[in-house]
UniProtKB/Swiss-Prot annotation:
Described purpose of this protein according to its UniProt entry: Catalyzes the hydrolytic deamination of adenosine and 2-deoxyadenosine.
The gene coding this protein: add
Keyword annotations of the record: Hydrolase, Metal-binding, Nucleotide metabolism, Zinc
An annotated GO cellular component: cytosol
Protein's recorded name: Adenosine deaminase
Note on how the cofactor is bound: Binds 1 zinc ion per subunit.
Phylogenetic placement of the source organism: Bacteria, Pseudomonadati, Pseudomonadota, Gammaproteobacteria, Enterobacterales
Active site positions, chain numbering: E200
Record flagged with keyword Cell inner membrane: no
Length: 333
């Protein structure tokens, strides 16, 4: 189902939600951190979704063991490097990796700016080693409140030339976008792109807010947009993309089943919706699964899957020249 003549992208992929179970085991042993299991087989149920979670917040707890073992900046650098290696193994030509430096720093009180620098270094080394193109998106974890998000933003801005965009993720219902207006004003002043998790746990009004108040150029998940035809029309008119994550939306109980997922409706409506993974290690999926298994189960035709692949590059945070160069590189391969 993947068109090998086109660039394959994943533009909604959490670096801190893609820490390998083996790496969690290795780092736990290295730093003498107590883990809930001591073998790979018995650890996996603790760090990977094995059945549908009741809600988004429950799903997010599966990510916690991955960051609990980040006891040094070298550990952060390692998981960043491995994220690029995983992308290369999946055949991705271009990936946008998003990460919350405060979340990664929290368990061991690492310097947040140091975490940002370690991630930048690990991703750069990975790109040089594996030939994948990547950009970094900084996340503010809204779950920890406005002040914590300000610390994350300051750390990200200290390395602004290596960050492409700002995102807001976490507890959408408990911490609405209205709390973070000044944060996003600073991000836009820095020249960053804006993408926001919205319409995942909350309704279409959260998406409107992300666009109108925070300046979102893309929406993460955005499943509730299907409830508001005027919003879908607006997304089409303004070319605001939706970063769809099929399997993730089932595992978080955001959508009841793949057959109920609105991605097909978005594509039929002309919305620039793309296929992405979200938290591949936690979910136990990869981009190939999303194209070959999840997308057909969501009712997408072969042509719609191809359109979603095209959309992934179309709405990527790259210049027109960079997109053209990537298309030419893949076509010539």
């Amino acid at each position: 189902m993947i068109d090998i003549t086109l660039p394959l992208t994943d533009i909604h992929r959490h670096l801190d939600g893609n820490i390998r179970a083996q790496t969690i085991l290795d780092l736990g042993r290295q730093f003498n951190i107590a883990l809930p299991a001591q073998t790979l087989e018995t650890l996996i149920p603790h760090v990977q979704v094995t059945s549908t979670e009741p809600d988004l917040v429950s799903f997010l707890t599966k990510l916690d063991w991955g960051v609990k073992v980040l006891a040094s900046l070298d550990a952060c650098r390692r998981v960043a490097f491995e994220n690029i290696e995983d992308a290369a193994r999946n055949g991705l030509h271009y990936v946008e990796l998003r990460f919350s430096p405060g979340y990664m720093a929290m368990a061991h009180q690492l310097p947040i700016a140091g975490v940002v620098e370690a991630v930048i270094d690990g991703v750069r080394d990975g790109c040089n080693t594996f030939g994948v193109e990547a950009r970094l998106i900084g996340i503010m974890s809204r779950t920890f409140g406005e002040a914590a998000c300000l610390q994350e933003l300051d750390a990200l801005l200290a390395h602004r030339e290596n960050i492409t965009a700002l995102d807001l993720a976490g507890d959408e219902l408990g911490f609405p976008g209205s709390l973070f207006l000044s944060h996003f004003n600073r991000a836009r002043d820095a020249g960053w792109h804006i993408t926001v998790h919205a319409g995942e746990a909350a309704g279409p009004e959260s998406i409107w807010q992300a666009i109108r108040e925070l300046g979102a150029e893309r929406i993460g998940h955005g499943v509730k947009a299907v409830e508001d035809r005027a919003l879908m029309d607006f997304l089409v008119q303004q070319r605001i993309g939706i970063e769809s994550c099929l399997t993730s939306n089932i595992q978080t109980s955001t959508v009841a089943s793949l057959a109920d997922h609105p991605l097909k409706t978005f594509l039929e409506h002309g919305v620039l919706a793309s296929l992405n993974t979200d938290d591949p290690a936690v979910q136990g999926v990869d981009i190939i699964h999303e194209y070959h298994v999840a997308a057909p189960a969501a009712g997408l035709s072969r042509e719609q899957i191809r359109q979603a692949q095209i959309n992934g590059l179309e709405i990527a945070f790259l210049s027109d020249g960079e997109k053209r160069a990537l298309r030419e590189k893949v076509a010539a391969a």
